[in-house]
């Protein structure tokens, strides 16, 4: 297992590579290069510079996240051909510089969604990402975008890049005639084009679950349960077509048994990497993100790590969204301290599993 940390790049993150290097048991990054809009080719020179910078800090980078899929691909428009070709060029450029897993999603229009990016936790005074369906129902998509932008502490947020959202109302209208089956059909077309290239290059595509794990604003969503992921993997049978199994995204719905889902897909070698975090259920479709500690949330992190250890022991893991603690100010969900604590906790569980299995 390789324990990693998400990093947004020099000048685009409140955290330095030096700080990440000092986290015990963290071997590298799940990297992000967010200067490109969805549909653009990631230039090889930019990728090379990013990777070299990480290596000089004594860290690895074999996973790249947020290689966003253009909406025209999801909608199945004729213009998708250009954007698919650009995506293929990006895959090849990433593979040339040692990238083995590419994380993306196929969520229409809106990526992950919260109704509050800094809800104060009464028990300790920290704050974390929060979702309440009742609050969401009183807001329009445009209001959600505006609220998210205002609460980002000046940082771009993955899935909420300005260029993706400036035509929000127009794009939402285009999805009125797209149901889940049609979205899957368009997804299959995309996979049939890109997965053979991944096989050729030795790269895995890892699709991230819907977050939260249910439809929003009437948009089709096709990646938020074991059954739906079975359908996704049936679209193209290849070990290069995998899941980025995010425990917090799938775990936002208490009907999802996360250890069972891990064993189901990990046993088939169809998990490319893991985002591991905890959530606290507060009511129907209402939750906040907690520390990684099992007792702080609603997910059993020991059982989650045990399932990973049993079925995907050579995988990549990173702690996912953390609380903002100790007066830290940074990108919501992506501070240093709580995620570093998460790594220490998850590595402790892993060490116990390793030693008890011998």
UniProtKB/Swiss-Prot annotation:
- Which Gene Ontology biological process is one annotated for this entry? D-glucuronate catabolic process
In terms of InterPro entries, this protein maps to:
Man_deHydtase, Xyl_isomerase-like_sf
Top-level EC class as recorded in UniProt: lyase
Source taxon at top rank: Bacteria
Please give one Gene Ontology molecular function term for this protein. ferrous iron binding
Which coenzyme or cofactor does it need?
Fe(2+); Mn(2+)
**Keyword Lyase listed:** yes
Q: Is Manganese one of the keywords?
A: yes
- Report keywords, A-Z: Iron, Lyase, Manganese
Give the reaction(s) catalysed.
Answer: D-mannonate = 2-dehydro-3-deoxy-D-gluconate + H2O
Write down the EC number: 4.2.1.8
From the UniProt record, give the pathway where this protein acts. Carbohydrate metabolism; pentose and glucuronate interconversion
One Pfam match, given by its short name, reads UxuA
Gene3D superfamilies xref list: Divalent-metal-dependent TIM barrel enzymes
Task: Please state which protein family the record places this protein in.
Answer: Belongs to the mannonate dehydratase family.
**What does this gene product do?**
Catalyzes the dehydration of D-mannonate.
Which HAMAP family did the record assign? UxuA
- The protein in question is named Mannonate dehydratase
Organism of derivation: Lachnoclostridium phytofermentans (strain ATCC 700394 / DSM 18823 / ISDg)
